């Protein structure tokens, strides 16, 4: 049976990611790789949105991915799982870079102000550099593909013994797991590209697979939703007060106890809240859920293009740049999804979409979304 609350978490979180990237592009906190501050405000108070959502939004998506992986594997073999994840995750983050995302790479490099020496390099070399620079938001599926392969190895060893044991997880264990998440955040972090956090994201992915894929655990999370929500809101306020104005995405903040505990308890609160109040499907949720993957893949191109054309030169008022950037994120994101998903080779290379499956097969697979 399909878990609609899981779908709803996924597409709502993707919307949050899009809005986050808007504020990230024009942040006043000195985070590099983007346009930066374009307003005349002494303090950009609306940047606080980044502090409210950044610690937990990708943690939550990896938990959802872990849950979805378990749901898929209940009806498929390990071999089918690897094949599916390779098509859904590896192909778009490798072949997709060469087929389409080099465009994003060009925009990213232009925003960064690449030097004149690049223009003197051979065309093929420039193309490869642009393709690699176009990775952008696809880091998520690169990490997820590696974790999916690791999951297959783990399954061959544990043979559901650990999974069955994890079904007994109670609220005390859920609270104490915050310490495990903090420990995981300290290891396997790449030194320069801060988004590749294999320790943290690997930990919550496997927690999603082993713990949150149990219906009885979700019932406990639903029951204790008021507690988790209260703690999460308190940690959110504390995080914003302590760190606002600082680079929240890098050391030492992104490995601090406050960062990781906020991420953990907010994830618990959202899972409990959505399972309790948003376990439904209607035409609106179906529309957003169906297009969430395409929006995730393409939204940054619209945003960064507007940033390059108008934000970098500040040729129009700041408020207009914000509005135009947000509109471009959604408009181009959804438009490219509709176009690319209909072109045979590119739908496979860029979005990881193979042949269309019969509706009955889709229903059996349940929550098998690309982000799972």
Task: Go through the PLM ranges and name each one.
Residues 1-372:
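Alpha-helical transmembrane segments and their immediate juxtamembrane cytosolic regions
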């Amino acid at each position: 049976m399909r878990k609609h609350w899981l779908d709803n978490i996924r597409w709502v979180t993707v919307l949050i990611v899009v809005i986050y990237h808007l504020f990230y592009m024009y942040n006043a906190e000195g985070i590099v790789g983007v346009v930066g501050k374009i307003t005349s405000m002494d303090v950009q108070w609306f940047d606080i949105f980044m502090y409210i959502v950044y610690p937990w939004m990708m943690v939550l998506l990896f938990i959802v991915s872990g849950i979805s992986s378990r749901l898929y594997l209940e009806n498929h073999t390990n071999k089918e799982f690897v094949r599916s994840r390779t098509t859904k995750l590896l192909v778009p983050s490798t072949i997709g870079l060469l087929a389409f995302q080099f465009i994003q790479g060009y925009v990213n490099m232009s925003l960064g102000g690449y030097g004149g020496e690049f223009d003197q390099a051979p065309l093929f070399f420039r193309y490869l550099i642009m393709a690699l620079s176009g990775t952008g938001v696809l880091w998520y599926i690169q990490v997820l593909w590696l974790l999916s392969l690791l999951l297959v190895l783990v399954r061959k060893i544990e043979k559901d013994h650990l999974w069955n044991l994890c079904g007994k997880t109670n609220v005390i264990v859920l609270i104490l797991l915050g310490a495990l998440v903090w420990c995981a955040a300290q290891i396997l972090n790449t030194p320069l590209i801060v988004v590749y956090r294999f320790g943290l994201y690997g930990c919550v992915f496997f927690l999603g697979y082993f713990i949150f894929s149990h219906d009885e655990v979700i019932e406990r999370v639903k029951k204790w939703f008021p507690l988790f929500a209260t703690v999460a809101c308190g940690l959110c306020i504390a995080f914003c007060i302590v760190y606002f104005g600082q680079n929240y995405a890098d050391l030492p903040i992104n490995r601090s106890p406050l960062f990781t505990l906020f991420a953990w308890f907010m994830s618990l609160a959202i899972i409990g809240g959505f399972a309790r109040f948003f376990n439904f499907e209607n035409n609106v949720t179906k529309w957003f859920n169906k297009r969430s993957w395409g929006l995730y893949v393409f939204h940054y191109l619209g945003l960064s293009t507007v940033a390059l054309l108008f934000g970098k030169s500040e040729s129009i008022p700041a408020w207009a740049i914000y509005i135009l950037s947000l509109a471009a994120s959604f408009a181009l994101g959804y438009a490219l999804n509709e176009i690319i998903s209909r072109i045979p080779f590119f739908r496979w290379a860029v979005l990881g979409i193979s042949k269309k499956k019969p509706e009955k097969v889709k229903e059996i697979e349940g929550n098998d979304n690309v982000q799972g």
